[in-house]
Amino acid sequence: MEYRVTATAGASPAQVYRLFIDVERWPELTQSMRSVRRLDDGPIRVGSEATVRQPRLPPARWRVTELEPDRRFTWETSGGGVTTVGDHLVEPDGPGSKITLALRMSGPLSGVMGLLMGGIARRYAAMELEGFRSAADAAAPPAPSAPPAG
């Protein structure tokens, strides 16, 4: 089972990627996160872990599995017969970026979990996408204005 949401932002891919990897800031960007606490120090890297607390969900320990600077941040968590992968992708789109968030569930109980939690997963993905888009747009330099007609 997979959920995918996409939006465009005026910020560069590098600006969006910085938001992706600043996981402890995520609760400032979206109400779908109560807290994110890194379990290691230093720059985020493959193998880094964090405890994520979200409304209506049990706390989950997420481990970074893939980093492509200025492009992709992927992490996963497992429990209760389900492995969940969260993929955060940013691509150039004209002067700005295309942001894609995907959530994939697999494992013996993923179908049942999808039925029980699919609505929450879709809502939270949309909230998180809007949080990243809004924060990226706020950080983007203003678009150049057109010269006066004359």
Question: Where are the model-predicted features located?
Answer:
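Beta-strand elements of well-folded, non-transmembrane domains
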Residues: A11, R56-P58, M105-L109
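Hydrophobic ligand-binding cavity/cleft-lining segments
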Residues: M1-G42, D137, P147-G150
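Intrinsic-disorder/low-complexity, polar/charged segments enriched in Ser/Thr/Lys/Arg/Asp/Glu/Gln
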Residues: M1-T6, E49, P59, R72, ...
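A conserved amphipathic terminal alpha-helix motif
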Residues: R104-G150
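Short, solvent-exposed aromatic-acidic interface loops
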Residues: S78-V82, A102-P108
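Hydrophobic/aromatic beta-strand elements that line small-molecule binding cavities or substrate pockets
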Residues: V5-A7, R61-E66, T77, T84-P92
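A short, structured loop/turn motif at beta-sheet edges
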Residues: P13-A14, D41, E66-D70, L89-K98
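Short beta-strand segments that buttress and anchor functional surface loops
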Residues: S48-P55, F73-G79
